[in-house]
From Swiss-Prot:
UniProt GO cellular component terms: extracellular region
Entry protein name: Neurotoxin Cex1
GO biological process, one term: defense response
Signal peptide: 1-19
């Protein structure tokens, strides 16, 4: 019983530690979400936590929104086969 509890705890921790992170990207254009206030940024945090993104925290890094604790289903920059601003 203790072994089962330890295994379950490890799996939960792995999910938390290895959560996806990256630049939030528009699926239609392939471009990163831009921001100008570096560091803590309400706009980036709001976008990352939006129900369709599912992130845990967002901030502005290198003039684009960086998100942490994203689900694997949320696309991050770059999207394969889609270049921002290029046809």
């Amino acid at each position: 019983m203790n072994s089962l509890l330890m295994i379950t705890t490890c799996l939960v921790l792995f999910g938390t530690v290895w959560a996806k992170e990256g630049y939030l990207v528009s699926k239609s254009t392939g471009c990163k979400y831009e921001c100008f206030w570096l560091g803590k940024n309400e706009g980036c945090d709001k976008e990352c936590k939006a129900p369709n993104q599912g992130g845990g925290y967002g901030y502005c890094h290198a003039f684009a929104c960086w998100c942490e604790n994203l689900p694997e289903s949320t696309p991050t920059y770059p999207i394969p086969g889609k270049s921002c601003g290029k046809k």
